[in-house]
Amino acid sequence: TGPLVCKWGGVQIISPKRTFIGEGVIFDTNYPQDIFIEEGVRLTSGVKIVTHFMNPNTGSYDRGKVHICKGAYLGMNTLVVKPVTIGERAIIGAGSVVTKDIPANEVWAGNPAKFIRKR
Protein backbone atom coordinates (compact mmCIF):
# COMPACT_ATOMS: atom_id res chain seq x y z
CA THR A 1 0.00 0.00 0.00
CA GLY A 2 1.09 3.59 -0.57
CA PRO A 3 1.42 6.38 1.97
CA LEU A 4 -1.61 7.83 3.72
CA VAL A 5 -2.94 10.91 1.95
CA CYS A 6 -5.16 13.24 3.93
CA LYS A 7 -7.10 16.26 2.76
CA TRP A 8 -7.13 18.97 5.39
CA GLY A 9 -9.60 21.63 4.32
CA GLY A 10 -8.88 20.49 0.76
CA VAL A 11 -5.07 20.67 1.10
CA GLN A 12 -3.44 17.37 0.08
CA ILE A 13 -0.98 16.14 2.71
CA ILE A 14 1.08 12.95 2.27
CA SER A 15 1.70 11.11 5.56
CA PRO A 16 0.20 13.76 7.87
CA LYS A 17 1.61 12.01 10.94
CA ARG A 18 5.11 12.76 9.61
CA THR A 19 4.31 16.37 8.71
CA PHE A 20 4.45 19.30 11.13
CA ILE A 21 1.99 22.18 10.79
CA GLY A 22 2.64 24.91 13.34
CA GLU A 23 0.30 27.29 15.08
CA GLY A 24 -1.28 29.95 12.90
CA VAL A 25 -0.40 28.34 9.55
CA ILE A 26 -2.83 29.62 6.90
CA PHE A 27 -3.69 27.83 3.66
CA ASP A 28 -5.50 29.58 0.81
CA THR A 29 -9.17 28.82 1.44
CA ASN A 30 -10.38 29.66 -2.09
CA TYR A 31 -8.31 26.96 -3.83
CA PRO A 32 -6.90 24.63 -1.15
CA GLN A 33 -6.90 21.76 -3.67
CA ASP A 34 -3.98 23.52 -5.40
CA ILE A 35 -1.72 22.90 -2.37
CA PHE A 36 0.22 19.62 -2.18
CA ILE A 37 2.46 18.84 0.81
CA GLU A 38 4.72 15.79 0.83
CA GLU A 39 5.91 13.68 3.76
CA GLY A 40 8.14 15.17 6.44
CA VAL A 41 7.49 18.82 5.61
CA ARG A 42 7.72 21.30 8.51
CA LEU A 43 5.57 24.42 8.29
CA THR A 44 6.42 26.49 11.36
CA SER A 45 4.23 29.14 13.04
CA GLY A 46 2.64 31.76 10.85
CA VAL A 47 3.45 30.25 7.43
CA LYS A 48 0.97 31.39 4.76
CA ILE A 49 0.42 29.62 1.44
CA VAL A 50 -1.47 31.55 -1.27
CA THR A 51 -2.62 29.94 -4.54
CA HIS A 52 -4.45 32.83 -6.18
CA PHE A 53 -4.58 36.58 -6.69
CA MET A 54 -7.25 38.78 -8.17
CA ASN A 55 -6.18 40.22 -11.51
CA PRO A 56 -7.04 43.95 -11.28
CA ASN A 57 -7.37 44.21 -15.07
CA THR A 58 -9.92 41.43 -15.50
CA GLY A 59 -11.40 40.96 -12.03
CA SER A 60 -10.76 37.22 -12.35
CA TYR A 61 -8.54 35.05 -10.20
CA ASP A 62 -5.08 34.03 -11.39
CA ARG A 63 -4.42 30.60 -9.89
CA GLY A 64 -1.35 28.43 -9.50
CA LYS A 65 -0.31 25.30 -7.65
CA VAL A 66 2.01 25.15 -4.64
CA HIS A 67 3.96 21.90 -4.19
CA ILE A 68 6.16 21.48 -1.11
CA CYS A 69 8.41 18.46 -1.48
CA LYS A 70 9.56 15.86 1.04
CA GLY A 71 11.49 17.13 4.05
CA ALA A 72 11.29 20.85 3.23
CA TYR A 73 11.40 23.30 6.15
CA LEU A 74 9.65 26.68 6.10
CA GLY A 75 10.65 29.13 8.84
CA MET A 76 8.22 31.22 10.87
CA ASN A 77 6.02 33.71 9.01
CA THR A 78 7.13 32.61 5.55
CA LEU A 79 4.78 33.58 2.71
CA VAL A 80 4.59 31.22 -0.28
CA VAL A 81 3.01 32.71 -3.42
CA LYS A 82 1.75 30.63 -6.36
CA PRO A 83 2.88 28.93 -8.61
CA VAL A 84 5.80 27.47 -6.68
CA THR A 85 7.59 24.18 -6.06
CA ILE A 86 9.84 23.97 -3.01
CA GLY A 87 12.32 21.11 -3.51
CA GLU A 88 13.18 18.21 -1.23
CA ARG A 89 15.00 19.17 1.98
CA ALA A 90 15.01 22.87 1.05
CA ILE A 91 15.17 25.32 3.94
CA ILE A 92 13.36 28.66 3.80
CA GLY A 93 14.42 31.25 6.40
CA ALA A 94 11.92 32.93 8.72
CA GLY A 95 9.97 35.84 7.27
CA SER A 96 10.81 34.98 3.67
CA VAL A 97 8.57 35.59 0.66
CA VAL A 98 8.84 32.72 -1.83
CA THR A 99 7.80 33.80 -5.34
CA LYS A 100 9.62 31.23 -7.50
CA ASP A 101 10.72 27.60 -7.45
CA ILE A 102 13.32 26.60 -4.86
CA PRO A 103 15.65 23.71 -5.84
CA ALA A 104 16.17 20.70 -3.58
CA ASN A 105 18.81 20.88 -0.83
CA GLU A 106 19.21 24.65 -0.89
CA VAL A 107 18.79 27.36 1.75
CA TRP A 108 16.90 30.50 0.73
CA ALA A 109 15.81 33.56 2.72
CA GLY A 110 14.64 37.15 2.33
CA ASN A 111 11.95 39.21 0.66
CA PRO A 112 11.89 38.08 -2.05
CA ALA A 113 13.65 34.84 -1.07
CA LYS A 114 17.16 34.54 -2.52
CA PHE A 115 19.67 31.70 -2.64
CA ILE A 116 21.94 31.58 0.44
CA ARG A 117 23.82 28.29 0.10
CA LYS A 118 23.62 24.56 -0.60
CA ARG A 119 22.76 22.24 2.29
Q: For the regions a protein language model found, what residue spans apply to each?
A:
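Acidic, glycine-centered active-site loop in nucleotide-sugar glycosyltransferases
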Residues: P103-A104, A109-P112
